[in-house]
Amino acid sequence: MSDSEKEYGTLHIERRDNIATIHMYNLTDGIVAGRKLDFHWEIAMALGELRDDQDIRVVVMTGAKDGEFMVSPRTPHYEDPGALAGHNEPKGSWKIFNGIIRAHTTLTEMEKPVIARVNGDAAGFGQSLMFGCDMIIAREDARIADIHMGMGDVAPYGPPFALVPGDGGASLIPLYMSPALAKEYLMLAKEYTAREMADMHIINYAVPMDELDAKVDGIVAKLLEKPPLTLAWTKRSVNRYIADQHNRTLDAAAAYEMVNFLQWERAGYKQDMDFE
């Protein structure tokens, strides 16, 4: 590891040739729990590190374990004494939401392609990160949902109260769907499979799990054949549209969600919900 490379507790970075792969850990794994670590902050720092690494030309984001790209914890982690941001704890909440804003800003501005290798379910911040990537290649049976309004009922992830989708979903989803479909997806926490999203032309590819690596590797190889400066300028040109969208909506949505976290009772908190 060079002096410029950092160690993270919620993810690890694998470097091979000119490719960096970010492996994201399950948020409820023991390697994360109780250590006052936060994935939202660390993924922002990791993306910034890779943006500055001139040896890296393509970044791939994936889950550390097959079956899960990145999902919100099912258990009430925000009530755990080891949580970074508990109820009525604005300092920890601000670090989380600042990380969210930095992560999306870096994904948008990074002068190199970022590929989502969706090797399992993507829910909550995981699906927002997925939509923030430049191309999305998923196993066809992966479940994808924005669980903020799910209240624990729609998908088996997320908190037992309603939240504004302030982690990037409210900004990015309207770029992928019509306003009517985007509001149905967000307001009802509607779940799709990757196959359904590919058929709707929302993501690039949905393939069987045993074909995922070949598809990702093929796309990465083609990108590496292109001149890096031309790739960078093409991405920056297209992403002015995405940057404008974030500038209009991301800070406000993040602020609304942070307010939700500070007043659960007003957000329909189901205190008797069984998390087992």
Predicted regions and their residues:
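Terminal peptide-recognition signature
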Residues: 22, 43, 61, 113, ...
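CoA-thioester-processing core
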Residues: 103, 107, 117, 123-185, ...
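C-terminal long alpha-helix characteristic of the crotonase
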Residues: 137-142, 151, 203-250
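Acidic, divalent-metal-coordinating active-site segment for phosphoryl/phosphodiester hydrolysis
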Residues: 124, 189-196
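Glycine- (often His-adjacent) and acidic-residue-rich active-site loop
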Residues: 29, 35, 55, 63-102, ...
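Intrinsically disordered, low-complexity segments enriched in small/flexible residues
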Residues: 3-4, 8, 25, 37, ...
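Catalytic-core regions built around general acid/base machinery
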Residues: 46, 99-111
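Conserved CoA-thioester-binding segment of acyl-CoA-metabolizing enzymes
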Residues: 1-62
